[in-house]
A protein has these predicted regions:
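Flexible C-terminal active-site loop/helix
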Residues: 2-18, 29-32, 275, 296-364
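N-terminal small/glycine-rich loop or linker at the start of catalytic domains
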Residues: 94, 118-143, 177-179, 183-187, ...
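Metal- or metallocofactor-binding catalytic centers and their adjacent structured scaffolds
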Residues: 40-118
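Conserved, mostly hydrophobic/aromatic
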Residues: 3, 44, 68, 107, ...
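Non-catalytic terminal accessory/regulatory regions of metabolic enzymes
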Residues: 1-46, 65, 69, 155, ...
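Short glycine/serine/threonine/alanine-rich loop segments
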Residues: 74, 121, 238, 289, ...
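Catalytic core of soluble alpha/beta enzymes
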Residues: 167, 172-300, 336
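Active-site mouth loops of central-metabolism enzymes
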Residues: 134-149, 191-197, 241
Length: 364
């Protein structure tokens, strides 16, 4: 079996606006973007992958088109590890994180999809098997800076059955408002996206002590200041989560060796796909670090996360971005219900994207 063609497809699906200034990573949020990779083989099997693409899909699509796809054609997709190692070595001059790493992550996911379909098995069974049909999910809310809207968003998440909630606020008033609505029986997480130096982060942790956060995510700039993150963990009094920005298992090794984190957050569309995500889980287990993957994805990267979580057999939470896009790639198949999401049971990733949605929302 050989790869005969590959195509990068950028989707931009408008989202319903329910807040005055919805934002993620500090930028306005108007569409839910998804960069898909379709890989075709001479056996008639098609695999689907997805790269992280929030606000940067055009750049990563260019990396796929100009650097990655030309190195895929004619290769054997059944040789996942050798093929991915070769691609990483060929393209390492472009950096081990960023658009090229995200593009390679999409390739790895597509290769696993192809191999699962070839074997007639869902990916979670190929990775070791599981009896779990549903996984716990948490609601991941957009940043608004508005306490009243934060309260309404938490109320909406609770009504939908979520029992864990993550905020993306940097001001404390919306976080206090969210805690007032959620109460203290609901785990509340806060992703601040690398705003502080270690000293300021420790001071903020002390100001947030009464919030009893389940974790504080990515508190330190730059995010590769592993010793600084470890300082915050040791002196801030709040469990620390990080790794969303990592491009490989080696990045996570630096985090765990520095004793910087309580929770590891590999992102399958950034870290190197399924292959590298599994390495991170094994590494974290060896250092007694809990893994909760970063997974605010629309397409195959979400499915890949579900399969890896299910195969791991642990209570790793699935991140669900609480937005309302005009359309979804899989209908209601992986829409959370009562705080959990179903694990696809079909071969490979289990479900192929809705082609009508692809055609309607495909970016030029």
């Amino acid at each position: 079996m050989l790869i005969t063609a590959a195509q990068a497809i950028l989707l931009q699906i408008p989202c319903e606006q329910r807040s005055p200034q919805p934002a993620l990573y500090g930028r306005p949020w108007r569409t839910l973007d998804s960069l898909l990779l379709r890989v075709e083989t001479d056996a008639g099997i098609t695999g689907w992958g997805e790269a992280f693409s929030f606000h940067g899909g055009l750049t990563t699509r260019a990396a796929l088109d100009s650097l990655v796809i030309p190195n895929l054609i004619g290769r054997d997709p059944s040789q996942i590890v050798p093929l991915m190692n070769d691609l990483q070595r060929r393209l390492h001059l472009y950096g081990r994180t960023g658009p090229v790493a995200c593009a390679l992550s999409a390739v790895d996911i597509a290769l696993w999809d192809i191999n699962g379909k070839m074997a007639g098995m869902p990916l979670f069974r190929m990775l070791g098997g599981s009896t779990r049909t549903h996984l716990p999910a948490y609601a991941s809310l957009l940043r608004t800076g508005d306490p009243a809207h934060a309260s309404r968003s938490v109320e909406a998440a609770l009504k939908r059955g979520f029992r864990s909630i993550k905020l993306h606020e940097v001001d404390l008033d919306p976080v206090h408002a969210a805690r007032d609505v959620a109460g203290y029986d609901i785990p509340l997480m806060l992703d601040v996206d690398c705003p502080w130096n270690p000293g300021d982060a420790i001071e903020m942790c002390r100001r947030m002590a009464d919030l009893e956060l389940y974790w504080l995510e990515e508190p330190v700039w730059p995010p590769e200041n592993y010793d600084g993150i470890a300082d915050v963990r040791s002196n801030g009094g709040i469990p620390i989560a990080a790794g969303v920005l990592a491009g490989s298992a080696m990045d996570f090794k630096h985090l765990v060796v520095a004793e910087a984190i309580d929770f590891a957050q590999p992102s399958v569309g950034k870290v190197g796909g399924v292959t590298e995500l599994r390495k991170v889980i094994a590494l974290a287990s060896a250092y007694n670090v809990t893994v909760h993957p970063h997974s605010p994805y629309l397409g195959p990267a979400l499915l890949a996360t579900l399969h890896v979580n299910a195969a791991a057999g642990e209570d790793m939470l699935v991140e669900h971005l609480l937005v309302e896009p005009e359309a979804t790639l899989y209908g209601a198949a992986v829409r959370p219900f009562n705080g959990s999401v179903a694990v696809p049971q079909g071969p490979g990733l289990g479900i192929d994207p809705d082609m009508a949605v692809l055609e309607r929302y495909r970016a030029p």
